[in-house]
Amino acid sequence: MSTPRLADVLDNADVIHERAALEAAIEGMADAIRDDYADDARPPLFVTIMHGGMPFAARLAFALGERGLDVEFDYLHATRYRGNTSGSGLAWLHRPATSMEGRRVLLVDDILDEGHTLKAVTRWCEDQDAADVRVAVLAVKVHDRCVDGVCADYVGVEVPDRYVFGYGMDFHEQGRNLPAIYALAD
C-alpha cells in the first residue's frame, strides 16, 4: 500500500489551530515556565522528544531565552508510532547523554495523546534520579483514554480526538514542518 500524498490529504483536512494561535500559546507557556524556573541556581535540562517535539521545542526555547531563562539542551528519541497512524510498543532510539541526577528536567513534546510514551519517558527520567520532571506539550488530545497519572504541566492548545498533524506531528512522516495543526477529515 502506498503512502497518501500530503497535498491530497491537506485538500480535505481541517485547520484546527493556525500558526498565530500556536505561537501565542507558546508565548503563554514560556511565561509560566520562566516563572517556575527563574529562581533556580542551575538552568533546567530541556529535553526534546524527537522527532515531533522539534519544531515546538525550538520555538519554546527561543521564547524562554527572550524571557531571560537559560536552558541546557538534550534530546531523546522514543516512539510508539514509527510512521504509522496508531501506536505499538515503545522503542528507544536515543537516550539523553546528559546526567539527570539532581536536575530539574523539562520534557518537551508535540502532543499528549494517550500518554504511554510520556509515562515511560518520565519514569525513565525519575529512574535517573532527576530531582523534578515536568512536561510541556504543544497539544493535548481531548478524550478519556489517557493513561492514569499522566498529565502535562504546561499545555499550549487542545485538539479534538481525531488524527492531527502539522507543527511537529506527522502524517506518515510527512507534514511535520507545516506551520499549523490540521486534522484528517472525519
What are these language model-derived features?
Residues 1-186:
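PRPP-associated nucleotide enzymes
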